[in-house]
From Swiss-Prot:
HAMAP family referenced in this protein's UniProt entry, alphabetically: RecA
Underlying gene: recA
NCBIfam families linked: tigrfam_recA
Top-level taxon in the UniProt lineage: Bacteria
Pfam families: RecA, RecA_C
Organism ancestry: Bacteria, Pseudomonadati, Pseudomonadota, Alphaproteobacteria, Hyphomicrobiales
Gene Ontology MF annotations: ATP binding; ATP hydrolysis activity; ATP-dependent DNA damage sensor activity; damaged DNA binding; single-stranded DNA binding
Function, as annotated: Can catalyze the hydrolysis of ATP in the presence of single-stranded DNA, the ATP-dependent uptake of single-stranded DNA by duplex DNA, and the ATP-dependent hybridization of homologous single-stranded DNAs. It interacts with LexA causing its activation and leading to its autocatalytic cleavage.
Organism of origin: Rhizobium etli (strain CIAT 652)
Protein name: Protein RecA
Length: 362
């Protein structure tokens, strides 16, 4: 047998294309059609299907027009930074297209009134409030394998408490239990997520590493597995308040695309999240319009095509809210200049010390 195989390798007259064809047909007989293919010549390859985040600026910063389907997404940040709001807005955008969405509420903290204000159709939203981390991830796996769900949100990784920890005593030390649970679950989930074309969004919290002298002491919960399996990682931060006279009516928010397997990462975008409303679309039109040179700013005045929008940003936002046709026209112009705006985002947010964990695993 060893002599025959040696002759086969050394025989220069063997037609490699026929040998490859035979090998490919054998693989397809064993594992099914489509189990191996040529990347460039396959006619069934389709464009990346995406779902909007509800923020025009973030959709542009992501490079593909939104969050990609059939992928794992991680949204992380400090408390009250807008993580759940961003996930709920993505659900609302998916439902507008007729998508079926699910919300695994491990924190038992979903506010249905707020979700409705963001545009979520509660009648058609599947919700689960599991008791343990194993139960949450089993429900996630079952829904993904069904192939019927478009967007599934797990809120949050930190709340996925292993059964052994819940059943144990309060002071028991169980190191690495949650990290092992996440690692095992993601190994199972990743193939079925791709086949079912389901987007799975994991919301995560931030913890501080003790004794860090250099670099950022921040890290996310649940071990390192999610950092590797996620195709997109978004770092969301509250950077200020939106005020109307003395009353705080929203948060100024910054989102950094820390990891992106679909397009160049490290783009950074800022927008307002208004209380009871979500992402301020008119605020984005003003800010992105100025950045792209579509909206002119002269002193405190904003204008578009020689038409004045208002004095001051809030007045310009109000004018666009009252004139939806003009707002749509500016949005269309912004989408046509998406490449230019994306380049500006890249200039604003290169990799820094805070991205140490993320940049290493791309």
């Amino acid at each position: 047998m060893s002599q025959n195989s040696l002759r086969l390798v050394e025989d220069k007259s063997v037609d490699k294309s026929k040998a490859l064809e035979a090998a490919l047909s054998q693989i397809e007989r064993s594992f099914g059609k489509g189990s191996i293919m040529k990347l460039g010549s396959n006619e069934n390859v389709i464009e990346i299907e995406t779902i909007s985040t509800g923020s025009l600026g973030l959709d542009i910063a992501l490079g593909v027009g939104g969050l990609p389907k059939g992928r794992i997404i991680e949204i992380y940040g400090p408390e009250s930074s807008g993580k759940t709001t961003l996930a709920l807005q993505t659900i609302a955008e998916s439902q507008k297209k007729g998508g079926i969405c699910a919300f695994v509420d491990a924190e038992h903290a979903l506010d249905p009134v707020y979700a409705r204000k963001l545009g979520v159709d509660l009648q058609n939203l599947l919700i689960s409030q599991p008791d343990t981390g194993e139960q949450a991830l089993e429900i996630t796996d079952t829904l993904v394998r069904s192939g019927a769900v478009d967007v599934l949100v797990v809120d949050s990784v930190a709340a996925l408490t292993p059964r052994a920890e819940i059943e144990g005593e309060m002071g028991d030390s169980l190191p690495g239990l949650q990290a092992r649970l996440m690692s095992q679950a993601l190994r199972k989930l990743t193939a079925s997520i791709s086949k079912s074309n389901t987007m799975v969004i994991f919301i995560n919290q931030i913890r501080m590493k003790i004794g860090v002298m250099f670099g950022s002491p921040e890290t996310t919960t649940g071990g390192n597995a999610l950092k590797f399996y996620a195709s997109v990682r978004l770092d969301i931060r509250r950077i200020g308040s939106v005020k109307e006279r003395e009353e705080v009516i929203g948060n100024q928010t910054r989102v950094k695309v820390v990891k992106n397997k679909m397009a160049p990462p490290f783009k950074q975008v800022e927008f307002d999240i208004m209380y009871g409303e979500g992402v301020s679309k008119t605020g984005e039109l003003v800010d992105l319009g100025v950045k792209a040179g579509i909206v002119e700013k002269s002193g405190a005045w904003f204008s578009y095509n020689s038409q004045r929008l208002g004095q001051g940003r809030e007045n310009a936002k109000t004018f666009l809210r009252d004139n939806p046709d003009l707002a749509r026209e500016i949005e269309l112009a912004l989408r046509q200049n998406a490449g230019l705006i994306a380049d500006r985002f890249l200039q604003n947010g290169g990799p820094d010390a805070d991205d140490g964990d993320a940049a290493a695993d791309m």
